[in-house]
């Protein structure tokens, strides 16, 4: 499952973060500290996508337009879904706030209202139906097994770098448009499966009421 999410500029300014319940805050206390250390290591030359393993959890991050989207997931959570989730957040955040998020003088967490979208997306990606869509992701999205993977000890305590590898970066840029389109379609299908039947029933009820009392 996706447990927690942060949105941070590459200069270190936090823009938004998911509001997590007390249990999640307690269980992820040390991992959130590690997340802050990871974010401090990032720069414009860092790998644009990476996964960093730490015990029972994995950090996945995506850098887009000078902004880093980072989520903490259970180690068993499919990497493809994690990056699809981050792509969805990146697209929505940039469409909603754009270059406003890059302006100087912003206060920390200036876009706290983005938590509403993060929570909705997290619920969708944490449903069993999301895992059912993995077959589509397998054929339509970039092979994320090639995404840089690090161990938290190697990164924070042994001096490993998150600087990008040229061949991997070019491959990721080449597939970015296809990845984003496929991820959005999978998310829309998951939303339809979750809310479509209720919407149809509500529409039929309204038609019946109109026909019964106003026709």
Curated annotation (Swiss-Prot):
The GO terms describing molecular function are: SNAP receptor activity
**Keyword match Endoplasmic reticulum:** yes
* InterPro entries xref list: Longin-like_dom_sf (IPR011012), Longin_dom (IPR010908), Sec22 (IPR044565), V_SNARE_CC (IPR042855)
The protein's matches in SUPFAM superfamilies, at most eight in alphabetical order, are given as:
SNARE fusion complex, SNARE-like
Query: Which Pfam families does the record match to this protein?
Result: Longin, Synaptobrevin
Instruction: Please list the residue ranges that the record places on the Cytoplasmic side of the membrane.
Output: 1-194
The record places domain v-SNARE coiled-coil homology at 133-193
Question: Which processes are annotated in GO (biological process)?
Answer: endoplasmic reticulum to Golgi vesicle-mediated transport; intracellular protein transport; retrograde vesicle-mediated transport, Golgi to endoplasmic reticulum; vesicle fusion with Golgi apparatus
Per the record, its GO cellular-component terms are:
endoplasmic reticulum membrane; ER to Golgi transport vesicle membrane; Golgi membrane; SNARE complex
Q: How does it sit in the membrane?
A: Single-pass type IV membrane protein
Q: Which parts of the chain span the membrane according to its record?
A: 195-215
List UniProt keywords, sorted A-Z: Coiled coil, Endoplasmic reticulum, ER-Golgi transport, Golgi apparatus, Membrane, Protein transport, Transmembrane, Transmembrane helix, Transport
Q: Which CDD domains has this protein been placed in? A: Longin, R-SNARE_SEC22
Task: Kindly list the places in or outside the cell where this protein is found, as annotated in its UniProt entry.
Answer: Membrane; Endoplasmic reticulum membrane; Golgi apparatus membrane
Identify its protein family.
Belongs to the synaptobrevin family.
On subunit structure and binding partners, the annotation says: Component of two distinct SNARE complexes consisting of sed5, bos1, bet1 and sec22 or ufe1, use1, sec20 and sec22. Ykt6 can probably replace sec22 as subunit of either complex.
Its protein name is Protein transport protein sec22
Organism the protein comes from = Schizosaccharomyces pombe (strain 972 / ATCC 24843) (Fission yeast)
The taxonomic lineage of its organism, from the top, reads: Eukaryota, Fungi, Dikarya, Ascomycota, Taphrinomycotina
């Amino acid at each position: 499952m996706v447990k927690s999410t942060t949105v941070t500029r590459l200069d270190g300014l936090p823009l938004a973060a998911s509001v997590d319940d007390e249990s999640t805050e307690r269980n992820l206390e040390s991992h959130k500290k590690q997340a802050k250390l990871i974010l401090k290591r990032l720069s414009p030359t860092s790998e644009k996508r990476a996964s960093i393993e730490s015990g029972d959890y994995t950090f996945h991050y995506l850098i887009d337009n000078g902004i880093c989207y980072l989520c903490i997931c259970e180690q068993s959570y499919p990497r493809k879904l994690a990056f699809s989730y981050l792509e969805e957040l990146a697209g929505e955040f940039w469409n909603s706030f754009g270059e406003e998020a890059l302006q100087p003088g912003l206060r920390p967490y200036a876009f706290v209202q983005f938590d509403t979208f993060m929570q909705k997306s997290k619920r969708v990606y944490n449903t069993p139906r999301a895992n059912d869509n993995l077959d589509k992701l397998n054929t339509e999205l970039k092979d994320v097994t090639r995404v840089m993977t690090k161990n938290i000890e190697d990164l924070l305590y042994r001096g490993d770098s998150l600087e990008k590898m040229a061949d991997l970066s070019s491959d990721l840029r080449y597939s970015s448009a296809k990845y984003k389109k496929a991820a959005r379609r999978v998310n829309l299908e998951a939303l339809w499966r979750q809310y479509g039947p209720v919407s149809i029933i509500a529409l039929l009820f309204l038609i019946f009421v109109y026909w019964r009392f106003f026709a």
